[in-house]
């Protein structure tokens, strides 16, 4: 948990230029203009968020990237708190590929993969803080493990986990951690793979024949709804939609699960 001088949230940072940034989301930034990112959610953001009404809600967001959804929700929400991993590789969820040098101890020399990832994520964080300033955002950022969220963050009406659980070693631990702090609703958006069927499936992506070091899982919607019911979120709305990323259209699903 990151607490300095009694302060649980990261201090705001000034970023001089878009040249210091990478952008995960295509965003029209006030005073800057349109910047292109890997994902363009502008035409489908309501579907992506399950058409949920964030009005006057306190929102917990896991993994904001460059903040497109953060600042969109903030238009109507009472507060948005985003959770990011510290820039410390002991927190990272890299798949431990032996052939990529990732199956190692924390004190080993950094691999080329890690160095490139560290630089990319640092520039993504710069993109978030540049947008934060340009949008005059009040959103707060907590740096720590989403598998062990502290009570000091307080209670939330809703949590958003969008296209993040596929990158995590233990998605159920993160869902459980969020559920402890959420009184109302959990929203999960992920890629849709109809070939996985309709049962509760969490399919492992990494294999010896690929280099998927940053992606662990593919899911069915039922995997999430079944475990969310275990956590007390038994009322579900599941929708399917398409979004643009990496110059392609992708099938996705969004689950809006609420406590009764």
Locate each region found by the language model.
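Conserved SAM-binding strand-loop segment of SAM-dependent methyltransferases
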Residues: 136-147
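Conserved alpha-helix/loop element of class I SAM-dependent methyltransferases that forms part
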Residues: 35-57
